[in-house]
C-alpha cells in the first residue's frame, strides 16, 4: 500500500456505528459497507504498522439528540444496559485514547463504546 500521503508515526481512526459482531437491521448494502470499513481498516493496520501508522475503529452506540423519535429512543434504550443513549461527549475520551500514546500498542482494533448494547440487556 502506498504510504506517500501519510507521514510515518501517525494514528488513523474511523467511526463505524456498529460492532462487526452485531447483525445490523438495515438493507444489505449498509451491512456490506460497514463490514468493508472494518476489513479495510484491518488491512491498512497490517500493511502500515511497520511504518508507525496505527489504524483503529471506534464503534459508538446510538447518540441521542432532540430530533429522534421518542418511541425509537425508548425501544433502543431497553437494549442498553447503561440505560440511556450516548451524548457526543461520551466519545471524547475514547477518541483521545485512540489518538494518543496510551494506545501505542493498539492497531487493527475496533473499540466498541455503546453502553453495553452489544452484550445485550439482562
Regions picked out by a protein language model, each given a short descriptive name:
Residues 1, 54-64, 99, 112-114:
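Conserved SDR Rossmann-fold cofactor-binding beta-strand/turn motif
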Residues 1-50, 62:
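Catalytic loop of short-chain dehydrogenase/reductase
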Residues 8-18, 50, 57-80, 90, ...:
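A glycine/serine/threonine-rich, flexible loop-to-helix segment
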Residues 15-18, 96, 107-122:
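Short C-terminal tail/terminal secondary-structure segment
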Residues 41-42, 92-95, 99:
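Short-chain dehydrogenase/reductase
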Residues 44, 52, 84, 101-102:
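Conserved functional loop/turn residues at catalytic and ligand-binding sites
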Residues 49-54, 106-108:
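Short, small/polar-rich loop/turn modules that mediate ligand/substrate recognition or access, typified
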Residues 80-91, 102:
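A conserved structural motif in NAD(P)-dependent oxidoreductases
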Amino acid at each position: 500500500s502506498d504510504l506517500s500521503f501519510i507521514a510515518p508515526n501517525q494514528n488513523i481512526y474511523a467511526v463505524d456505528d456498529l460492532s462487526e459482531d452485531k447483525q445490523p437491521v438495515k438493507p444489505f448494502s449498509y451491512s456490506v459497507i460497514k463490514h468493508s470499513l472494518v476489513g479495510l481498516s484491518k488491512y491498512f493496520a497490517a500493511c502500515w504498522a511497520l511504518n508507525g501508522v496505527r489504524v483503529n475503529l471506534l464503534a459508538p452506540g446510538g447518540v441521542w439528540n432532540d430530533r429522534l423519535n421518542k418511541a425509537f429512543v425508548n425501544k433502543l434504550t431497553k437494549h442498553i444496559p447503561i440505560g440511556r443513549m450516548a451524548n457526543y461527549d461520551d466519545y471524547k475520551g475514547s477518541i483521545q485514547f485512540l489518538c494518543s500514546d496510551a494506545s501505542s500498542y493498539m492497531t487493527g482494533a475496533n473499540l466498541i463504546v455503546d453502553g453495553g448494547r452489544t452484550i445485550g440487556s439482562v
